[in-house]
C-alpha cells in the first residue's frame, strides 16, 4: 500500500517458503499486541507470500497440504482485510483532505496520543479548533473519519477473533513439511517460466479489458492479475525478478492506489458524508485527479511496442516450447498422484502407436484427428491419477481430478475435457451415449470419445502386467476404411495396399507379446470395445521381426 512502511528494522532477507511461514507466526504475535497499520500490513504481506508460493507450487505438486495451507492463509488474510482497508482509507483522507491537515500526520508520527487508534488521533487533531497550525476542518473529512473510527474499533475485534481461531500449531507443522516438497522443484525452472506465461496471458487479457472500459471492476481485476504474475516471478524466477522487480512493484503500486481511491470514493458516497453538492464535487475532483495521474502513468509504461508487457513476454517461452512445457507440467503433476507413472507413460506410447496405425490404415475419428490424438495422449498419461485415492473406482476419481486440474497453457480446454471422459472409461462399464458423462455431448463428440476410450482400453491391457514387456505394436493389415473396389494406380502399381474385407480381422502385431501369458487374457477381454468401434474382429499376435519404434508425442 502507498503509505505504510514495515514497523521492524531488521533486514528483509528472503530465504524461501520456510522463512515466510515462520514470519507469519511472528507477525501474528505483533498484531496481537498492536492492531496498528504496520503490524496488520506486515502480517498480510507474509500471508500473501505464503499463499502465492502455494499457488505456484500446487500447479506442479498435487500434495493436498498446499491447498489446505493456502486456504488457511486466505481465511486469515481476508479477515484482516477490512481492518487494513480502514487504515488505508484513513491515510488517504488525511492526505487528500482539502483543509490540508498535514500537520495532523506530523503530530501522529511524532508520537502524540500513542494509545489511540490512528483514526481518532487524526480526527482529534483536525477537530481541535485551538490548534494554531490547523486549517479549517473539512466537514466531509471529519464525518468520514468518525465513521472509519467506529469501523476500526469493530474490525479490531474481528481481527482478534481471527487470530485466536488461526491454527498456529498446524501452520507450524506445514512450515516443516511443505518447504521440503518445494525444494524438489528447481527455482528458475522452465516450468515456472511456463507458469509465469500463463499468468502473463491472463493479465494481458485483463489489461486489454481495462483499457477499453476503464471501470473500477476492470482495474481491480487487472491489479489482481498483475499481482499473480508478479508473485510467480518474485517467488520462482530469480533472474527475471532481479531485472523486473522495480517495474513490477511500481505497476502494482499504481493499480493498488487506483483501487484505494475507488474504495475511498465508494465509501464516502455510500456513507453520505458530503454536507452539500459543492463538497461532493470538490472531493470527487480531488480523487479523480489522483486516480487519473496513476492511470496515465500506468498507460505510459504498459502501452506500445516497447511497453513492459513486451519486455516481459520476450523472456518467456515461445512457439512449440509452450506445449512441450505444458506436457512436462502435466507429467510432473501426474507423477505425484499415479503410483506407477512409468506404466502410464508406456500406455500413452502404445495408445499413440495404435492410433497412428489406425489412421494409416484409413480409419478416421469423428472429430479433428490432431485434437483427438492430443486427447488420447493426455487421457493415457493421466488415466491412473485416481489411484492416489485408492484402487477402487479410481477411473471415476481420475475423471474428477483431470476435470478439476485446469488447462495448462498450450493445451486446448476441449481436448483435456475430452481426455477426462476417455480416462473415465479406460476400465469398468463400457461407455454408452446415454451415460451421464456423454449424453450432453454432440453426436460426433460422443462417437469420438467412445473411439478413443476403445483405443485406451486396449493399450492399457497391453501393459496389464505393468512390466513393459510389450514394447511396441503395429497394425499388420492396413486400409480399414477404404473400399475394396477403389484401386487407384500409378504406373500399374497400386498406390496403397488392398483393403481388408468387411469381416476380416484387424491384426495387431506386438513386440514382446505371448499368447499364453496372463496379459493375453486381459487383452482378449478388453478388445471388445475396439471391435465394436471398428466393426470387425481385432487379433493380437507376436511380432516376428521387430520394427523400429514409431515416433510418438
Segments and roles (model prediction):
Residues 1-325:
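Cationic, histidine-enriched alpha-helical/coil surfaces that engage anionic ligands
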Residues 8-9, 188, 326-346, 381-387:
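Active-site flanking loop/helix segments enriched in acidic
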Residues 105-106, 110-111, 484-486, 492, ...:
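Intrinsic, low-complexity polybasic segments
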Residues 229, 328-338, 435-446, 511-515:
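Short hinge/gating elements
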Residues 343, 355-475:
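Divalent metal-dependent catalytic cores for phosphoryl transfer on phosphate-bearing substrates
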Residues 469-482, 495-496, 500-505:
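Short edge beta-strands and adjacent turn/loop segments
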Residues 504-523:
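A short interface-forming secondary-structure element
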Residues 534-549:
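A short amphipathic beta-strand at an alpha->beta junction
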Amino acid at each position: 500500500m502507498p503509505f505504510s512502511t514495515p514497523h521492524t528494522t531488521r533486514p528483509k532477507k528472503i530465504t524461501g517458503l520456510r522463512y515466510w511461514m515462520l514470519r507469519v507466526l511472528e507477525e501474528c504475535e505483533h498484531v496481537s499486541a498492536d492492531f496498528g497499520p504496520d503490524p496488520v500490513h506486515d502480517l498480510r504481506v507474509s500471508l500473501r507470500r505464503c499463499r502465492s508460493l502455494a499457488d505456484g507450487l500446487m500447479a506442479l505438486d498435487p500434495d493436498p497440504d498446499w491447498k489446505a495451507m493456502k486456504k488457511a492463509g486466505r481465511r486469515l488474510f481476508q479477515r484482516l482485510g477490512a481492518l487494513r482497508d480502514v487504515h488505508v482509507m484513513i491515510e488517504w483522507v488525511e492526505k487528500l483532505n482539502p483543509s490540508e491537515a498535514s500537520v495532523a500526520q506530523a503530530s501522529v508520527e511524532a508520537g502524540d496520543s500513542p494509545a489511540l487508534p490512528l483514526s481518532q488521533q487524526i480526527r482529534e487533531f483536525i477537530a481541535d479548533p485551538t490548534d494554531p497550525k490547523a486549517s479549517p476542518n473539512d466537514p466531509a473529512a471529519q464525518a468520514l473519519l468518525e465513521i472509519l473510527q467506529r469501523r476500526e474499533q469493530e474490525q479490531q475485534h474481528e481481527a482478534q477473533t481471527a487470530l485466536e481461531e488461526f491454527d498456529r500449531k498446524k501452520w507450524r507443522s506445514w512450515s516443516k513439511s511443505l518447504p521440503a516438497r518445494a525444494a524438489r522443484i528447481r527455482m528458475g525452472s522452465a516450468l515456472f517460466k511456463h507458469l509465469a506465461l500463463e499468468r502473463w496471458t491472463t493479465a494481458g487479457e485483463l489489461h486489454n479489458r481495462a483499457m477499453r472500459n476503464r471501470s473500477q471492476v476492470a482495474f481491480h481485476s487487472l491489479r489482481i492479475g498483475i499481482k499473480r504474475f508478479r508473485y510467480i516471478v518474485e517467488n520462482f524466477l530469480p533472474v527475471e525478478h532481479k531485472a523486473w522487480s522495480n517495474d513490477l512493484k511500481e505497476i502494482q503500486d499504481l493499480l493498488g492506489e487506483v483501487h484505494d481511491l475507488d474504495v475511498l470514493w465508494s465509501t464516502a458516497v455510500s456513507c453520505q458524508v458530503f454536507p452539500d453538492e459543492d463538497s461532493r464535487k470538490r472531493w470527487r475532483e480531488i480523487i479523480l485527479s489522483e486516480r487519473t495521474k496513476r492511470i496515465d502513468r500506468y498507460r505510459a509504461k504498459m502501452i506500445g511496442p516497447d511497453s513492459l508487457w513486451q519486455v516481459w513476454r520476450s523472456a518467456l517461452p515461445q512457439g512449440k516450447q509452450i506445449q512441450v512445457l505444458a506436457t512436462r507440467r502435466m507429467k510432473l503433476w501426474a507423477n505425484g498422484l499415479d503410483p506407477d507413472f512409468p506404466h502410464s507413460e508406456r500406455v500413452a506410447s502404445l495408445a499413440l502407436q495404435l492410433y497412428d496405425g489406425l489412421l494409416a490404415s484409413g480409419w478416421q475419428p469423428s472429430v479433428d484427428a490432431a485434437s483427438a490424438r492430443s486427447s488420447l495422449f493426455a487421457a493415457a498419461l493421466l488415466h491412473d491419477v485416481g489411484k492416489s485415492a485408492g484402487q477402487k473406482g479410481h477411473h471415476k476419481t481420475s475423471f474428477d481430478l483431470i476435470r478439476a486440474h485446469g488447462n495448462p497453457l498450450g493445451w486446448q480446454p476441449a481436448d483435456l475435457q475430452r481426455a477426462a471422459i476417455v480416462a473415465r472409461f479406460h476400465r469398468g462399464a463400457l461407455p454408452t451415449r446415454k451415460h451421464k458423462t456423454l449424453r450432453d455431448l454432440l453426436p460426433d463428440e460422443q462417437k469420438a470419445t467412445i473411439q478413443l476410450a476403445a483405443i485406451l482400453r486396449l493399450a492399457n491391457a497391453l501393459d496389464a502386467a505393468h512390466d513393459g514387456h510389450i514394447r511396441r505394436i503395429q497394425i499388420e493389415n492396413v486400409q480399414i476404411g477404404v473400399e475394396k473396389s477403389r484401386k487407384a494406380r500409378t504406373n500399374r502399381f497400386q498406390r496403397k495396399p488392398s483393403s481388408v474385407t468387411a469381416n476380416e480381422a484387424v491384426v495387431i502385431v506386438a513386440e514382446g507379446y505371448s499368447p499364453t501369458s496372463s496379459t493375453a487374457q486381459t487383452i482378449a477381454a478388453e478388445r471388445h470395445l475396439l471391435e465394436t468401434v471398428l466393426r470387425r474382429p481385432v487379433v493380437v499376435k507376436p511380432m516376428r521381426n521387430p520394427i523400429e519404434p514409431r515416433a510418438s508425442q
